[in-house]
Every structure is written in C-alpha cells, then in structure tokens.
Amino acid sequence: MLTFAPLNFLAIGVGATLGAWLRWVPGLRLNGAGWPWGTLTANLVGGYLIGVMVALIASHPEWPAWIRLAAVTGFLGGLTTFSTFSAETVDMLERGVYATAAAYAGASLAGSLAMTGLATVRLLLR
C-alpha cells in the first residue's frame, strides 16, 4: 500500500520535473505549424518506457514504491502529455485541417498503445 511519505512526494516531484524538461526540448526542436513532431515523439518514447517500467517493476516486487513513483508517475507522467496532444489536435480542427488532426490523433493513440505493448511484451518474454 502506498503512503503519503515524504520520500514518495519527493520522488514524484523530481521525476515529474525531469520528465517535463525532457518533453519541452523535443517540442522546441521538432514542433512545427503543420505537425507537432516533438509531442508525438515524447508520447511514443514515453509509452515505450512505461511498458519497460511495467515489466521491470513486475519482475522486481522487492523494489520500493518510490522507484515506481519516481519513474512512472513522476518522470514518465511528466514526459508524456495528453493535455498538449489534445490542445494540438483541437488547434488543427479549429484551423480546418481535419485530415491532419485525425491522422495525428490516430498516430498518437495507436502509436502510444503499440509502443507500451511492445516494450511490455518484449521484457515479459525474456
């Protein structure tokens, strides 16, 4: 059972800060007016890494809760971003680029699910 221990709060906070910074950099470098490659990249990489962490945590029940909280809830929660994805999709819809919005939404959702599943399956089959 998780508790509201100070170490858990610190783990989430540090992880979230690092994840958000890492999400910000590809957004600066890769996001363009037509397609937000930086956000898509962050979400796909984050989805894959969440799968990795789910498999690693499942195979190491002795790990303390703060490790999962720092890595998954904090870092990967800060790296991946449903709110930015949603805002970018709505912006595309408002600009009338419906096919681009649909493609971006589909690529983000299907890609993130595929990356998470790929990582989880690969590690669990070891």
Curated annotation (Swiss-Prot):
Regulation of activity is described as: Na(+) is not transported, but it plays an essential structural role and its presence is essential for fluoride channel function.
Report TM segments: 2-22, 37-57, 65-85, 101-121
GO MF annotation: an example: fluoride channel activity
**Which InterPro entries does the annotation name?**
FluC
Q: What Pfam families does UniProt report for this protein, alphabetically?
A: CRCB (PF02537)
Domain of life of the source: Bacteria
What keywords would UniProt list here?
Cell inner membrane, Cell membrane, Ion channel, Ion transport, Membrane, Metal-binding, Sodium, Transmembrane, Transmembrane helix, Transport
Residues binding Na(+) are: G77, T80
Q: How does it sit in the membrane?
A: Multi-pass membrane protein
CC per GO annotation? plasma membrane
GO BP: cellular detoxification of fluoride
Q: Which reaction does it catalyse?
A: fluoride(in) = fluoride(out)
Q: Where in the cell is it found?
A: Cell inner membrane
Family per UniProt? Belongs to the fluoride channel Fluc/FEX (TC 1.A.43) family.
Q: What does this protein do?
A: Fluoride-specific ion channel. Important for reducing fluoride concentration in the cell, thus reducing its toxicity.
The name this protein goes by in its record: Fluoride-specific ion channel FluC
Gene (name only): fluC
